[in-house]
């Protein structure tokens, strides 16, 4: 049985308007993580990553740098119980 994990992440800094969501979606699909990503009105990006623990950890680590034009200042990670409800990875508009 796979070791599953779920991370609820809030990323602060210059993370909107820098292709963060599309890059997160592409990397999530590459590493095989389900979930979603969206911009928040306060300028942060919020995301949920669920899947095999090692893949979720790769996504969380990626959030500390993000795409090349992002300037990440802080990452708030909340580890939650996996729900198994996520299917694929999407951008919430």
UniProtKB/Swiss-Prot annotation:
Q: Does the keyword Hydrolase apply?
A: yes
Q: Does the keyword Hydrolase apply?
A: yes
- The portions of this protein that span the membrane are none
The protein's UniProt keywords, in alphabetical order, are: Hydrolase
Residues at the active site: 21, 39
Positions of disulphide bridges: none
Q: Which reaction equation describes what this protein catalyses?
A: an acyl phosphate + H2O = a carboxylate + phosphate + H(+)
PROSITE patterns from the UniProt entry: ACYLPHOSPHATASE_1, ACYLPHOSPHATASE_2, ACYLPHOSPHATASE_3
Query: Might you give the EC number(s) for this enzyme?
Result: 3.6.1.7
Q: What is this protein called?
A: Acylphosphatase
């Amino acid at each position: 049985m796979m070791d599953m994990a779920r991370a609820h992440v809030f990323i602060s800094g210059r993370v909107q308007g820098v292709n963060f969501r599309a890059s997160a979606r592409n990397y999530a699909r590459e590493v095989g993580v389900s979930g979603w990503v969206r911009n928040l009105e306060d300028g942060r990006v919020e995301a949920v990553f669920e899947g095999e623990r090692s893949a979720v950890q790769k996504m969380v680590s990626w959030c500390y740098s993000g795409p090349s034009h992002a300037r990440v200042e802080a990452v708030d990670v909340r580890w939650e119980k996996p729900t198994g409800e996520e299917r694929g990875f999407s951008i919430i508009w």
